[in-house]
């Protein structure tokens, strides 16, 4: 179970690479949008599946 848990969560850098943006963009989205980010301790973590669904929903476009 620990292996599956670890595989599901990615950090800011991996999220940026996954979405093709910079780490600064991810941090701005955390502040300004409803990006599915989870704060675990001092770190922001993401699930790839939640990020993909967020992008597909069109919510990643900042108006």
Where are these regions (language model features)?
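Polyanion-binding surface elements
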Residues: 1-28
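Major-groove DNA-recognition helix of helix-turn-helix-type DNA-binding domains
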Residues: 19-45
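A short, Lys/Arg-enriched interface patch at domain edges and termini
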Residues: 49-63
